[in-house]
Amino acid sequence: GVIKPLIIGHQADLKPSTNPFSAIVRQPLASPEPEPEAMQDPTLGVAEVSESVTQVTPTVPTSPTASTVPEAPEVPAAPDSLTPPAAPAPARIPTAATTPAPAVPEAPPVKPSKVRKPVDVDKLKAELSEWGAWASMPQLGSKKPQDKKKSKVGGPSLVYRFPGDSQVLQEVDIAVVMESTYPFTAGDTAVSVQNIIRHNPDLTFGVIHIADNSNAPAKSMFELPANVKWVDVIYLESTEVSEKFSGLVSSPVTDEQVREVLDAIESSVTGNHEPMHALYENAINPQTRTWSAWGALGHREFMNAAIKAAGKADDISLSQLFDLAYNFFLRIYTLLDRVLPTARVYHAHSSGNAGLVAAAGAVQNKGKFFLTEHNLNIRDSINKLLSRDLNRRVTSEAPLKLTTDTFERFWTQWWLELGALNYAEAELITYLYPQAVTDAQELGGAQEKAEVLPDGIEWEDLEIPRIWRQQAVPKLERKISWKLAVVGDFQPSKGIIELIDAVKIMVDGGKTDVRVDLLKPTDGSTTDEPEYYSRCVAHIKQLSVENYVRLRDVKDARDVMHEYDALVVPSFQESQPHAALVAMTMGVPIIGSSVGGMNALVTEELSDAQHKKIGASGELVPPGDSAALATLMAKLTQSPELYRAWHENALARIKAFYLLPQVMRRYNAIYRNLGAGKHKVIGGMAMVP
């Protein structure tokens, strides 16, 4: 059907949804069964174990990364109660340093009969030393933080706060929450955020940047606008925080408090997040907590619930199951054990970790949580975990239908519940293309909170290269060679190997007048995988297509895009690639994969504000289909009439839907309606109260 034009700047007041968020009901954790007295060997499968535990803390926490599941080491039978020394962090599941936050309050006085006995740490250390279990584990965060270079420009009072720094940050209108992107790495999401900040100079911004660890990039890739007041960095891996957390696992808690933790988890699984709100205020939020939730981790009732959730699994030992739960708790602690800078709006640019921090900031400072999904991060994280192509559909049934072992099932459930919580807490959720709204609903997204708001581009900035392309189109009949460009990171998801295969098919079929340049920006804006880059180079040589596929270093791809007859996007997943917006603004057609937001950008019939239909600006084929892509590249060169239509439609589509000023007016209206600035905005116009 026809997609009607996005009307930007004409939405009524944003109000909390009157419809309660109804998450897809999933299987809750069952109540624990009575335990026999004997403690069994923790290396046995959970299906073979039912135990009596007074207090348990991890043997050797290990956990999967987003794409791998390391095996836990074999350990002997656990003593009656365990509390580890500084627990080693997992290889990629983060353990982070906290920006200064109040110390965890001591638990309130409780009746001795209801408090579980603390463990003998010295005794445990001696036992662990005999086992030799800890000595063999990698210690994350052991390097001292590198000296951080203050990044570019910003306002005269721009402040950088890294973990361990206690300086107070000023209140801002909007705190954008980023994970491993802006301002320290470039890419489509980072470019979008830079544009948002730069084109809303009447509002003040701060950046909460979630980085892997102290070795992550810390030099800005952008000239930060003057309305950026601070950058606050959170590390996901830190020895200090890991040690602090391992101590908190021994915190005394009552039976009722353990039950409160379990009730919050079980209720969230069924879509009721109110108990989790109460738990956050009572036992997690540094501003309001009166006890520590982390002590529940090592107690009998909690572990029995975990055993029950694992069911009759025979592929995970008790110690591995505990390590899994430990890492889930450690991640939450890493992100939430902090007092966040004050803002009126917390704008997360991905669900997951960034969304969780933004939701916490909104609660702490009585602000609003606004979520933008550039990609569907929950879907992508699950697909990476399960080694699937990123374009594959994911639903709430993924833990049961897609996973092959207990580790995968628990981690898939983790991502689903984290996404559902993000969607429930957000005041408004914007997506770059319509299909993303539908896909998010299958992950627990609420349609009544959804709005399609694409990225935009500045028309005037590309006027000269646009004229050059317009002058080239009438000469198509006389062309003797064609140049196609590819822009993007050298990563498997970008489909470069499949593109090289397509070129080989085309050349073997006698089509030798087409050359493809793989543009490699030298400004640090790409995040190449060295192994994959080497594979691509070797593949070009192996197929003997060096004369038809060329690697070209460029400072900025937009500076040379006018030299090319088409942009090829062979990816397995894309939302709305900025390179495609640049190409279309010059009138350069797009060919590539039918994934993500590419259909909305390139092929779906649109209708502008005057109800005039706008056709395709190129053609797309299934991802990974090298033969179809070879045919499409040849087709581009064989019909001047089709090429002219794609050229004209590219310009028309940009003018109708993707101009930056209209997109930025909508962002400004959203921010103000959520409480930023001094005036409320309705329909893009400021309304003085």
Language-model segments: what does each one mean?
Residues 604-626, 635-640:
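Conserved acidic donor-binding segment of nucleotide-sugar-dependent glycosyltransferases
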Residues 572:
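Aromatic "clamp/platform" in nucleotide-sugar-dependent glycosyltransferases that forms part
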Residues 401-405, 529-554, 566:
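Nucleotide-activated donor-binding/catalytic signature segment of Leloir-type glycosyltransferases, i.e.
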Residues 628, 635, 642-657, 663, ...:
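A short, well-ordered alpha-helix in the C-terminal region of glycosyltransferases
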Residues 460-461, 466, 472-494, 500-505, ...:
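Conserved donor-binding/catalytic core segment of Leloir-type glycosyltransferases
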Residues 589-592, 596-603, 610-613:
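Short hydrophobic beta-strand element within catalytic cores of glycosyltransferases
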Residues 515-534:
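Glycosyltransferase donor-sugar binding loop
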Residues 307-333, 343, 399-468:
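Donor nucleotide-sugar binding/catalytic pocket of nucleotide-sugar-dependent glycosyltransferases
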